[in-house]
Amino acid sequence: MLKPYFWISAGALACTLFTTNLIAAEGADKAIVKDEHRDIGVGKQTAATHTQHPDAQWYPDAGLGLFIHWGIASVKAMNISWPMIPGRALAQKRITDPAERERIIREGDYDLKGKPNPITPNQYWEMAKDFNPQKYDPDKWLKAAKAAGFEYIVLTTRHHEGFALWPSAHGNFDTKNYMDGKDLLMPYVEACRKNGLKVGFYYSPPNWYFEKDFKNFMYGGGAKKNPEFPALDADLKPRTNTHTAAELAAHQQAYDEMVRGQITELLTRYGKIDLLWFDGKPPTPHGSKCITQEEIRKLQPGIVINPRLHGHGDFVTYERTLGTDKPVTGWAEFCNTWTAYWPHVDNAPFRAPGFVLGQFTKSRSLGVNYLLGVGPTREGEFVDGIYQNMAIVGDWMKQNGVAVKGTKPLPSTESASVPATALSHARYLFAAPSFRNGGSYEDDLLPAQDEILTLKGISRPTQIQLLRDGSALKYSYSDGAVTIELPASKRTKLVDVVQVKL
């Protein structure tokens, strides 16, 4: 049974400060995502149309997905891929003093912290030698995910770092070179099917290991703002090697063949795959044309494809911030993390369940799926915090799932003061908790207030109740609008759902 998580009512705090800080935090997230997407080749995304294959029509009503980031970064419980790339500070500051540029190059201080980057690409890739998970049990993960109400799973088969979680015949940095060729994907696929979950593969066409002799490992925004700095090699030293045009062309052809070959393996070795989640495109002349969506659908006719490789796909993706305030007309997904990180990072606190459920219900009110990110440890385990938070979400879903599963945004003739969904003759209003200063953790929760909810453009309700326990709520109705009283005494730290029957 869902623990009440009841608040103690308190006086109102300044809403303006909260809103201002929330906007500032979202603005910072947007800037980071924009810079990273530019570096990996994610451009404008469209989903004007989507596949009509009957096997793909599960997607818009799926609601809740689990995004699992796993790779060699788990060896040191650090963020994935991006820590090897210095120069974010240089993306914000133009260095015009030649002496200061020389100092930065000499000391490797590309993040302007008075010290070199904590890890070089070569040091990062060395973690592959120590990546050999002995407690990998995806069935345990996904049994808990299913009980929590998740409908589909997406696992990183290969991130930008370049390490593939299966023994690939293409490229030279995967489990065939390490772990005696152990395949980490097949147990995951089997566990998805066993637990009735849709199978999703994340795949990054950018492969920094494959590109290590050619790539500038300076953060793209930093290199763009400060073009006087040299390109950096895999030791984060000024790159000294050069390549002929023929060598570059041969590398680019091999790169395209590697990406095409690995995607083909993912779509032919593991049976039916429900979703393919790309993240960028190869830095080659052919780029997104290394494999077409038509070729992908010949291998997997019912697959759902995101637009981050080809620029168009079956659904648009919003990352870190929900990029719309209006109901979407096509398919869409919002992905964010349960902690501050995509993979497992030691001692990273989990965002409050009320925050996560607030983002989930806001997404569903707009017709958007919510893809929530977690990561296993180096041994292949979920930490207790994941299971504990899944249990809270699962209990909430048992009582309130009808408000988010199979529901749609409100009809265009209706509006509400809070996020809301519609299903037949019922409407569901979501009263989410508030957080101070744009925060998202338990310590940021603000005390509950009495709240007035409004729903306009409807006929006279036949019943209004708190969905979790069926208790009646006071309301008034006039001129097609209902005003509902939700007292602080009935609020919880989670999202409180009000059911309006018409």
PLM region spans:
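Intrinsically disordered, low-complexity Ser/Thr- and Pro-rich stretches
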Residues: 4, 14-15, 393
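Mature catalytic domains of secreted/periplasmic carbohydrate-active enzymes
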Residues: 25-502
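Bacterial N-terminal signal peptides
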Residues: 9-21
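Bacterial N-terminal signal peptides that target proteins for export
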Residues: 1-11
